[in-house]
Amino acid sequence: MKFLDILLDLLFPRRCIFCGELMEEQGTACKACEGSLPFREETLCSETMEPLDGLYCALSYEKQLPRGITNFKFHGKSHLAVYFSQLMMKKMGQQLRQGQFDLIVAVPMQGSKLRKRGYNQARSLAEQLSKELQVPCSGCLKKIRRTKTQHELSGRERRSAQKDSYGCEVLHGEKILLVDDICTTGSTLKECARTLKAAGASCVIAATVCKTPNHKKTMQS
């Protein structure tokens, strides 16, 4: 190990993004957390998600995952997009490669939040997937209306808040891979898909790192 690496380890000890434990080896997660990640058995969600043409989610938002996602979104750790995109490719890379997408589009973030956070985690994921899949990453989708923070709203409030809150450049029949970090009710993804199709997309399939556990047979929002 180089002197600089030793110095960095002393100043900034490596901690698991999930449990916070110190790690002796290089990496993002400790072996215990890495070995117990809540991967979904089926990555393709069976819920009715129109106007989405499909939704793929790699993991379930439970156990240790919420802490890792929180670190990624709110604690300035944009570099974790590399790690989470690798988890997505590990679980559903074959399906995404077979998708033959024309563009990869991230769920956009409103300007005030972007300025405060410094990055859009969905965009960071989309850029990493763009490299993996060799598909262009487009910024054609924009947030045009300010909305409340989603986790503060009920399912019905989320649907109402998202309505007409996005805009998109003119498209010409492209097949789109829509990317976000988490699917909760699906209202954001569905509104983005509606906007993309209204702009001319022929097909919109979404992919997220994780999805909140759903104990009902169909989504209510």
Model-derived regions, located:
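Glycine-rich phosphate/pyrophosphate-handling loop used in enzymes and phosphotransfer proteins
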Residues: M1-D180, T184-S221
